[in-house]
Each structure stands twice: as C-alpha cells, then as structure tokens.
Amino acid sequence: MLLERCVSETPGINGGYPVVDGTRTPVRVIVEFVRQGADEQHLQRLLPHLTLEEIRCALRYYETSPARVDEDIERNARAWNELQSRPWPA
C-alpha cells in the first residue's frame, strides 16, 4: 500500500495531523502503542477497524516522517496536561 494512499492529513480532522486514511485514527496512536510494547497482533486487537496492512503502512509513514508524528504526540500531550490542570466542576 502506498503511503500517500494509507495516511492523510486533512484540515479539520485531528488538527490536520496524519491519520490512517478513511478513518480518524491518528498515526500517533499507533506509534504510542508500539512505544508501550504493542506488537502487530496486539495492535489489531486494540484497533480492530484497521487492517494489518493499514497498521504497517502507518508505521512506515512514521519511519519516513517522524517529526510530523512526534509533533502531533507533543501537541496531544500538551492538550492532555492542560486538561488535567483544570479544576473539575463541583
């Protein structure tokens, strides 16, 4: 599967950062699961809507464009930290 056919960046979807084409699954999610030790079979169980080919393609995309995906990981982490720092409504 060609990278340009399996990963897309569309304004308004995941902030324009890369997602598996035809889904709203960010490439960063797959990369973060792999960093936590998930193998391909585990990824298929965690993300059953993705084919093994789509998972592999997303990982190849990361190999060729790590800065873009890492930027999305950092952006997501900052957003999460900001949410965690807000007081919960009573």
Labelled PLM ranges:
Residues 1-2, 11-12, 26, 76:
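A generic short-segment signal for beta-strand/edge and adjacent turn/coil regions
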Residues 25-90:
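Long, charge-rich, low-complexity alpha-helical segments
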Residues 22:
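Anion-recognition interface
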Residues 3-19:
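Short, Lys/Arg-enriched N-terminal segment that forms or immediately precedes the first helix
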